[in-house]
Amino acid sequence: MKPKDFMVTLQRKVAFGAVGPSAVRGQGKGVLRASQDFCSQIALARVPKSSAKRYQIWLNRQTEFLLEALPIKNRPWGAARKAINLFLRDALYNKYLSRQFKLRSVEAWLEIPLDSAVVKGLKSHDHRGELPRWPGLKNLTQDVSEVFQVFASKQATLKGIARVHLDMYLWLDNR
């Protein structure tokens, strides 16, 4: 039997581990802690599991909520989205959180957390010039992110994995 606060504490630990200093480096003072605190409080029980469209609407709202929580003027959409995607990926990978909140049911919809290393890996597979120039995390917009996510989905399908897992392959390829 686990104490009542076990899942809350575990979610906080996963949030702080997933969204580390290197994840949001250079995004502004206070962005790291605000992102960690926000992710530690995401209501994982409310993640929509009925459709990809509902999940995407939820994810967009969470990104907006995190942007509002950031303590800086120029709020970087890309950094907020990356933080949430990192957290959701690590929550999926955590046995307890994944089981408790049935996160495997949204595995196929989770986004790959975008950054320059992931984009470099994606671009190495872009033989048709489908991908735009990487604007950097600070200047990443939802529309540009979507182009990278669609391309990542195609690459993941070729590997027989969900898009969120492609991050591991691309990260290792860049080492």
For each predicted feature, which ranges?
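Phosphate/adenylate-binding glycine loop and adjacent helical scaffold
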Residues: 1-74
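C-terminal accessory module of base-excision DNA glycosylases/AP lyases that mediates lesion recognition
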Residues: 1-17, 21, 26, 72-81, ...
